[in-house]
Amino acid sequence: FSSTLDANCEDKEASLYAATATYYLSLITKGEEHRHYADLTKKAAYFALSWYYLWDVPFAPGQMLGDIGLKTRGWGNVSVENNHIDVFVFEFASVLQWLSKEYAEPRMADFAEVISTSMRQLLPYEGHLCGIAKSGFYPEVVQHTNWDYGKNGKGYYNDIFAPGWTVAS
């Protein structure tokens, strides 16, 4: 389950691809084949969920993310090498909602809601520009640990790299 170009280690992104791909395969199959792909979707989703925070990282007074009240619960850690959180979700919340119905596991849908609401915290709009953001800009590298990418450190986000995928996700 490793896929990123910027990390040579385990990461959440490949598990999201696996969960999404097997989800679509389960939608177009029936019977035993459907069950096989649904079970693979569930397995990949559980692995992906292991990358998501179930608690809120504390920020010191004066750190931008703490000052704006960012809650890390529901955010996904990128990898063991790239130690920041980001909004790389795409269809994963929909996959979790489907799994919730498919397996009668309400906690899947519950956590899909946690992820969805958490991801909206840094969406900039007039009157809520999230510190250094501009309308339409969504940060990729949200620095919640002492690991520093060379821009402000913990409690800030790196505004140097914000590709279009953050908007698409």
Q: What spans do the regions from the language model cover?
A:
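Glycan-recognition and catalytic cores of secretory/periplasmic carbohydrate-active enzymes
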Residues: 1-169
